[in-house]
Design a protein with these regions (language model features):
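A short acidic, Gly/Pro-enriched loop at the edge of an enzyme's catalytic core
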Residues: 91-103
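Acidic active-site catalytic centers that drive phospho-/nucleotidyl reactions
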Residues: 14, 42, 65, 89, ...
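Structural signature of beta-strand start/N-cap positions in the alpha/beta core
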Residues: 39, 59-60, 84, 99-101
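Class I SAM-dependent methyltransferase SAM/SAH-binding core
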Residues: 45-92
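Conserved class I S-adenosyl-L-methionine
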Residues: 1-35, 38-46
Length: 104
């Protein structure tokens, strides 16, 4: 999809995903157990639902999305201090090789 569509969809994305809440809770638990104490990069975070839930288990987490609208939504409200949201194109990651212990 084009970036502009994701920017437009950003304000309602989280509400749309609520129908799958039970599935997400299961996923949060599984992911959290795999990233304990690790430096983690998440690609395509959207509004940061996963990142906000699992980041407390990580040493540090950078959650990225190429949609500025999604990152704007992700930065709303409270989130762990070890979590950073960045607008980044997954095709052109600005990080050095081996900068992270895990990827989502």
């Amino acid at each position: 999809m084009k970036k502009k569509i994701w920017d437009l969809y950003a304000p309602i994305y989280e509400k749309a995903m609520r129908a799958d809440r039970k599935c997400y809770k299961f996923m949060y638990h599984r992911v959290k157990s795999q990233i304990v104490g690790k430096e983690v990069l998440e690609i395509a975070t959207g509004p940061g639902l996963l990142a906000k839930h699992v980041a407390p288990a990580a040493k540090r987490m950078i959650a990225t999305d190429y949609s500025e609208g999604m990152i704007k939504e992700a930065k709303k409200g409270r989130y762990p201090e070890n979590l950073v949201f960045e607008v980044v194109d997954a095709k052109h990651l600005p990080y050095k090789d081996d900068s992270f212990d895990g990827y989502i």
